[in-house]
Amino acid sequence: MAKRKIIDVNIEVDHITNWIKNYFIKNGPNSKAIIGISGGKDSTVAAALLCRALGKDRVVGVIMPDGTMSDFTIAKDVCGYLGINSIVVDINSITSALYRAIDDGYDDDHCIKNNPAVSTNTPARIRMSVLYALAAEMHGRVVNTCNKSEDYVGYSPKYGDLAGDFSVLSSYCVREVKEIG
């Protein structure tokens, strides 16, 4: 059995914070970090690290329910706790319109959203489009919040959660993200 890697949380937090600072110095000294906030561990820890590195005024949390969102209140609370500006964009009308447009292309009573691969991955891709639209508007950089464990097992949809201008947690497995948080 492989030996469990022990991390020094303080060293890792300093390392990540310095990496974020350097990234923004080189790639957008006046830019904001645009991050999707789900209320989960990854977006919460990433947002906290961004605040530490850039200051809360340069971090924008975007909450994107698809109609309903089980962790909506938690996501709002995360933004409030960190003191970051938050924007809520309900993507339900976008996903519904996309499904309708695709279904209209078929001659039969097709229902594309009944395909689990579509109904799971499409909202993630739409969320990433929303983040990039907001980043363009605010001269921001989009944050990828995936961790190493998700990348390893292929949990994240291509052009969805995996997209971003930079990744804060990609070197850390779930256990390490929890320790850092």
Predicted regions and their residues:
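Histidine- and/or cysteine-centered catalytic micro-motif in compact active-site loops
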Residues: 147-149, 169-172
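A mobile, often basic/glycine-rich helix-loop segment
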Residues: 155-171
